[in-house]
């Protein structure tokens, strides 16, 4: 069914759709710079880093329209970090397991090279400017090590500035009895176990290998490990059968918004049936941005006369 809009409504709609396209293009650009990090390591300041971005994107210095996009979407979101970021974090001060290798799994330390770009935090969305998305990015001014678990030579789980920053709002809110869906390297359970007003933490994790590694090499280093109980199981199935009351339910079952969106939508349906406990979702702003892009794409096709079941490619 084709949608008919007034001229002013159509103008607003096209601004939304144009912003969505730029959001997606900038997101692809940022993903690519994290993959080709060596290109940016010569930068020594946010200004030089921004210049590298312009060079990487291939924007001519006289292309003011493209430069304006970079200025608006990216430049203000760049901020460097130093050693104090990790040095002052209680997890990093306390949890320093001895590296080991067991089968396909290896627990050890990876390194951010000086001026290597990375994602710093969840996206910032400006709902007053057509849902413009800015992704904070950063780099360290010196080489910095961080804990990582690799599987078959690929980093699978790690404790990075992005994980630290994106979890902090949920850590600040935590109190009482907490249900955690997904274990990882235990950053969130560790941080909330340090709080006096957090009494009990139940973690549901499906992967027995992850549980074993955590229990043997990481949990013994926790000062308040007595607060933490780990259950092997599927998070969705556990929620369907659960009879216990929790103050907060924190979901961390995905590596990124792309693989997390289907699980997030399932959990939102389950949340409707819970009369207790506040549900919280890691990277929720990014998950909602991903959903918004999908809905705007469907809406755009409807404007062009396509239905949800009729792709313009068929």
Give residue spans per PLM region.
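Conserved SAM-binding motif I beta-strand of class I
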Residues: 200-205
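N-terminal auxiliary segments of SAM/dcSAM-dependent transferases
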Residues: 1-140
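Conserved SAM-binding loop of SAM-dependent methyltransferases across substrates and taxa
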Residues: 185-197
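Conserved acidic residues
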Residues: 176, 199, 247
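Conserved alpha-helix/loop element of class I SAM-dependent methyltransferases that forms part
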Residues: 144-147, 161-177
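C-terminal substrate-binding/active-site "lid" region of AdoMet-derived donor-dependent transferases
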Residues: 255-314
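S-adenosyl-L-methionine
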Residues: 207-248, 256
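Conserved class I S-adenosyl-L-methionine
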Residues: 175-186
């Amino acid at each position: 069914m084709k949608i008919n809009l007034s001229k002013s409504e159509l103008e607003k709609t096209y601004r939304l759709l144009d912003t969505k396209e730029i959001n997606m293009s900038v997101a692809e650009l940022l993903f690519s710079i994290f993959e080709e990090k060596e290109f940016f390591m010569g930068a020594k300041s946010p200004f030089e880093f921004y210049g590298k971005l312009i060079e990487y994107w291939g924007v001519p210095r006289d292309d003011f329209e493209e430069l304006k996009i970079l200025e608006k979407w990216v430049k203000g979101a760049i901020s460097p970090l130093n050693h104090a970021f990790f040095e002052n974090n209680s997890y990093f001060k306390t949890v320093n397991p001895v590296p080991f290798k067991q089968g396909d799994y290896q627990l050890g330390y990876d390194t951010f090279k000086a001026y290597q770009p990375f994602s710093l935090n969840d996206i910032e969305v400006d709902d007053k400017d057509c849902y413009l998305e800015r992704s904070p990015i950063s780099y360290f001014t010196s080489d910095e090590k961080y804990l990582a678990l690799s599987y078959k030579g690929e980093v699978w789980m790690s404790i990075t500035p992005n994980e630290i920053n994106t979890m902090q709002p949920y850590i600040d809110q935590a109190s009482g009895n907490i249900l955690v869906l997904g274990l990882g390297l235990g950053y969130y359970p560790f941080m909330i176990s340090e709080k006096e007003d957090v009494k009990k933490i139940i973690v549901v994790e499906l992967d027995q290998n992850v549980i074993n590694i955590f229990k043997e090499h990481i949990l013994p280093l926790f000062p308040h490990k007595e607060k933490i109980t780990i259950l092997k199981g599927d998070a969705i199935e556990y929620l369907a059968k659960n009879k216990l009351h929790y103050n907060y339910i924190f979901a961390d079952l995905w590596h990124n918004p792309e693989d997390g969106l289907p699980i997030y939508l399932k959990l939102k349906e389950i949340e409707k049936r819970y009369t207790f406990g506040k549900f919280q979702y890691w990277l929720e702003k990014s998950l909602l941005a991903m959903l918004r892009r999908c809905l705007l794409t469907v809406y755009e096709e409807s404007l062009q006369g396509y239905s949800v079941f009729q792709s313009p490619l068929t």
